[in-house]
Amino acid sequence: MLGCLLERISGQTYEEFVQENIFKPLGMNDSGLMSFVSIIPRRASGYWPGSNGTENADRPDPRVGFSSGSLYSTTEDLLRWEEGLFGGTVLSLASLRKMTTPFKSDYACGLHVNRVNGHLMIEHDGNNIGFNSDLAYYPEERITVVVLANLNGTVTGEMTRALAAVAHGETPPIPSVHKEISLSKEVLTRYAGTYQFPHYSLKMIPEGNHLLVEFDNGGTLAVFPEADTKFFSKPWPTQFEFSKNEHGEFTILTRYQDGAKEIGAKK
């Protein structure tokens, strides 16, 4: 919607506007709107986890994402973007303040704003078929961390926090290793049901020796047990943990992803 408004007001295509008003002024010479027709030098191929190991990812029409994504860039160019955005080149300081002010939760205008290990962090991740990314800025120390990956399932958020810890002179967290165990059908069945989170709901469906997570947007995710109450995704940095309520019933579900957690309740 915003991309369509931008085109109507400016009289330019979205690609023309972004190139003329953002990429060229900031010197982002290796960034643009993705195309599988044009030859883009040094373009990375995308991969995803398959049943027999890593596979070539599908190549969706980049026009589908339009102004919500479908851009290509480099770590150097994204550093230039952060310097331009937080240096007052892209937006006025008043607009930047509005953009980075959280509303109700830690989410501001397209950015997550919270404290991680005592450091103020302004961050957002991104993903597309075959690619994952994470971009974080620590305004108090003026530290930027950019992580780009051409493999779905890469824990870019965890990598960002580890690199930020090094930049802050701290010890980076040790990545967790998940080991699958077997649970009885009876144990898996007690977790079946619909769970309501603040902004979405999901269903837990027992399937074989794992649970199938069915999101309200139609997406699904298989999660495997590593303990009686803990489950993890093999390709994605997502874990779930079931907890009992005051009556001793498993009705509380906590979702962990990229260092953040959300708590939902069984309907």
Language-model segments: what does each one mean?
Residues M1-P139:
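Short, surface-exposed loop or secondary-structure junction motifs
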Residues M28, G87, N150-T154, A165-G169, ...:
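Short, well-ordered loop/turn and helix-capping segments at boundaries between secondary-structure elements
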Residues D58-R59, N132, A136, L148, ...:
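Short linear motifs in exposed loops
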Residues L71-T75, G153, K185:
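Short, solvent-exposed loop/helix junctions and linker helices
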Residues H119, E140, G157-K267:
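Peripheral terminal and inter-domain segments
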Residues E123-H124, D134-L151, T251-R255:
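Short, well-ordered beta-strand elements
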Residues D125, A149-N152, E207, D216:
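Histidine- and/or cysteine-centered catalytic micro-motif in compact active-site loops
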Residues I129, V146-N150, T154-R161:
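Extracytoplasmic and endomembrane cell-envelope/extracellular-matrix remodeling and assembly machinery
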